[in-house]
Amino acid sequence: MDSDLDRILPIASRALLCEGNRDWAGAYVSYCKVLEEMKKSSAARDRMGLGPLTGAEACSWNGLYDNCLSKASKLRKTILESEMERQNYQLAAKLSKKAPVDLHPLRPVRSQTPAYTPMTTRMMYRQTRGAQSEVNLSTPKQIYSKHSPPSTSTSSIVSSSYGDAPSYLAPSKPNRSPPLKPEDPFASFNSSASAIAAASKSAAASASALSSDTGRSATMNSTTFPTAMKSQSTTKPTLSNSVSSPSIQVSNNQNANNSTPLSFHAPIPPLHVPAVPLTSASHSSSDGKSRKHPSPYKPYLNSSHDTLGSSTRPSSADTAGSPATSPPATADSKTIVSKTISASTTQQTEPLQQTTPSSDFEYAIMNEIISNHEPVYWSDIAGLDDAKNSLKEAVIYPFLRPELFQGLREPVQGMLLFGPPGTGKTMLARAVATEAKATFFSISASSLTSKYLGDSEKLVRALFEVAKRQTCSVIFVDEIDSILSARNDSGNEHESSRRLKTEFLIQWSSLTNAAPDKQTGHSPRVLVLAATNLPWCIDEAARRRFVKRTYIPLPEKETRYKHLSHLLHNQVHCLTEEDLEELVNLTEGYSGSDITALAKDAAMGPLRNLGDALLTTSAEMIPPISLNHFKASLRTIRPSVSQEGIHRYEEWNKQFGSQR
């Protein structure tokens, strides 16, 4: 059960974080992953012969499953209805089932758009009359509606879509007939081509009525439909049976029945991006099949986590100024959207504008942001207490409590982790990405180099510009010596490499003079975290900017014991405490990666002894791992770090390292 929680809760936390940032597509994919992991856990319990859980655990997990399923359905409907509205489609409350047409993915096509663009999903409705319409499922922050009221956030733009727009443009007549309960037209991806065509005419007529009411255009006699659909004159239809898009209830500062029309902004064209094939998560979640769990019970969380777990919920520093995490609920035909938007809703548009890329270089940098990585926690790393405390002091505490770290307590903006290979430097950086609740940029030499003259410097500038727009950012550069190696006058260094180093150092220094945020008054929190196996190869100017230089040594005796115990925790072995103590003494001088390789090789020992009998032996009859298997593997797996290399690291640490 604990392993299920460790695998599911970080994904659920990432879904909440995406909702807080109004990334509906990312939240939808994360919720689908949560449901998939829950189903896998349930199937595993079935195979093990375990009965269904009862009591508080059952109620807690059932609530989690139903909540994720409901949110995923609402997010899917929100994204699809918003795109259909943007493509001038009007959906009826109940579509015909006579001519079902499935939704097919397109193959990736070659596009002239620059390569530095985010991934989106492109779908196509194949209609019976030969008319085709493409629907781009972009992120909601790129979706704009020509019916949106002024000074609204992205969620308000989505909410003021085709179904709700006429309700506040003009007073509608009361509907005497009982209200229709809108059905989800996307519960099954089968729709009628004739119904879609009729809905398109309704959308065109409603757009004509909106234009005449606001005084923007004289008339709309014809509408051009997307992708090879002929223009034809339309008449204004009734909207009593139309399905309204999901709406967000806002503050009612004015009466909803007031007939004064609102002014509208000019429509903003959407951003076109190249098409890519569907991912497994998004395609499996859009197949229209039932979401019921196959087993009679559902895998469970502890009762202390009511919805998605409070232990991994994003901190207040991340969700400050972000919208409510629940997707908009679907409104019926009588729902009336308020004309006024509260001040808090208006202020929520600023983070979206700040994080929107303004160039292809910023697109490339945003692709380096780690969002879907396997979480690593401090408890997963054995030993290295000094390094953990230094990282908490430099990253975790200042990012979570920025009001306490000001003036002389302002955190450092550069930290270097150096030491022999395989000691856990990159693992510490991954733990920082999980624990800090900050935007984590994983940068390598390939992220900042380009074959075009001057593009490398622009990529470096875009990296720091995007990082400064975030509330808290960590720029992790693995193998920093490949980017900021020592400069020399021997002529062996290329001019482009020298310009790249100079630009990186200049942008790094600009973090100190960055202007504070107008709302919070705090300067942007950006930390450059680097790791290297060759600290003596780093340029002196870069070494000065790394205020803290922490040495990551080889694991000590106690650390090796914890590491071996963790590796053998889920394995069938017959090692006693005395055997582990002897094994710890035999692995003197081994790094963390060497010990992991040794344990893997020893685990293969029982299988090697079986030989060809392995093909007919059941898993229960395989012998356990013993000390003799480890001793045999010690002759094969040797230490990767020499004593001369360790001595050199210790000398550099004495001269330049941060001693505690």
UniProtKB/Swiss-Prot annotation:
Positions of the UniProt region annotated as Disordered: 141-186, 209-334
Annotated positions of the Phosphoserine modification: S177
InterPro entries: AAA+_ATPase, AAA_lid_3, ATPase_AAA_core, ATPase_AAA_CS, MT-severing_AAA_ATPase, P-loop_NTPase, Spast_Vps4_C
Record Pfam families: AAA (PF00004), AAA_lid_3 (PF17862), Vps4_C (PF09336)
GO cellular component terms given for this protein: cell division site; cell tip; medial cortex septin ring; new growing cell tip; nucleus; old growing cell tip
Binding, ATP: G419, P420, P421, G422, T423, G424, K425, T426
Record flagged with keyword Nucleotide-binding: yes
Gene Ontology terms for molecular function: ATP binding; ATP hydrolysis activity; microtubule severing ATPase activity
CDD domains membership: RecA-like_VPS4-like
GO biological process, one term: microtubule severing
Bias (Polar residues): 213-239, 301-313
Subcellular location, record wording: Nucleus
Record's protein name: ATPase-like fidgetin
Species this protein is from: Schizosaccharomyces pombe (strain 972 / ATCC 24843) (Fission yeast)
